[in-house]
Amino acid sequence: MIFKKKYIALAAAFSLAAASVTAQPDADYETVVSPDDESTANDGKKHYFTALTGAAVTSTGIFLWNKYMIGAGWTQVTADYVAHFYEHEQSWDKDWFWTNFVLHPYQGALSYMAGRSANLNRIESFGLATLTDFAWEYFCETNAPSKNDLVYSSVGAFPVGEMMYRLSLEADQIHYLMGYTLNPERIWSEFWTKQKPRGTTGNIYELALSFDLGTSYARTSFGYDLGNQYEVFPVFASPKIAIVYNDPYGHDSNEPYSQFNLDISFALGAGSGRAMKEMDESFFHDIRVMSDGMLFARAPAIGETASTLGLVFEYDFIWNNLIQLSSLAPGLAFKQRIPFEKSDMEWQLHGAWLALGTTQYDYLYRGATETPNSLFREYSYTTGAQLVARWKWKSLAGQALAFDLHGYAMYDFADQEQDFADTGWELLGLLKASYELPLSRRVRMGVKDELYVKKTLYSEVEDIFLVANTVSAFAKLQLK
């Protein structure tokens, strides 16, 4: 019952945030028209059949692939199982971390984009993603309907789907295949409607590609007689793309996600050689998706500054040898740019309700205790609070000094507890500091230091304290 109330409250918050959009005229949301093909002009009409069939075809394709190509056991549903769907009890599932918190939001985002590509508004597209997710959980799997999937594949579909939908239109300016890659649902909608989705282009405010080389050191203080574990990951390489969609400062809009930040990175390197888990001995990996988007924004006039105040939504994902973290968190944000004669100073402060998140249960994830014989997950589902604080100084010559703090106060609630795990508070902080110098108008070099700290306050088992420091040098191509 607690889960249902939280889910309904979160869904209602999204509906209210999007309601202002449907009440506003679409004057600032123009149609994308191909310069060499007037047939692509959008008629503005809602194509519900195209949206429903697009979402259904995608879900059916995913189901058939898993059933016949992979032979997944969970796809072996029967007519009797489907007929008694109302008897299926929900549970917190134990799927692979990547599957639950990247692939499921992406699958939901496909349904969301099927709606948006057929001119449905955000509420309708969110409803389509929710409907598709419900059908998947109750009719397409023999597993118990997953509580976390019902959130991440619907609510999580909104930020992922809206960002990809908007970036797909921007990618058309490079090549139409890039647009289809970011939003595959356009293939279906454009085939039937003979028109491109609605939206504007030219909204990319900043776009940067960077490449890091670095090293990482960690110390974990376990309870009981396990003592301290020291690990050194000697070298890793990490490509990254950073996108700022519209200027974060002085932004005024009723359009959800008319301004957002999106950072995606992947790292691979040498393992520590002495980890408790064999894989960590050989390889270092780090995959991150860090984002925040404005749901509603106003630009208050405060002196000579460019300021933004409004509702924000945070979607974060981190998965590496030391961390398993995800968050869906709506909240408030204030952003401000202060101009000086030869430089600018920018700062942001976000405070959010962490509606549903995860963090690794270190005793299992780090292999510190014996692995249970039954099916288990190495992470705990959480709720709590999230804080984002940013500060940046940049000169007109191109130098930049920046600090970025992501803080999480996560509570492992009892409803999701596993028999061999524990509940309690887990406090996490991720602080990054960087400095960069320009080599040319587009190329920059810099250094970065990242400090990760985690302290647990468990109810019954002994607490854990983890500190990790990562140092790297990077080259950046500032495309915009």
Regions found by a protein language model. Name each.
Residues 349-353, 376-443:
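Intrinsically disordered, low-complexity segments enriched in Gly and acidic/Ser/Thr residues
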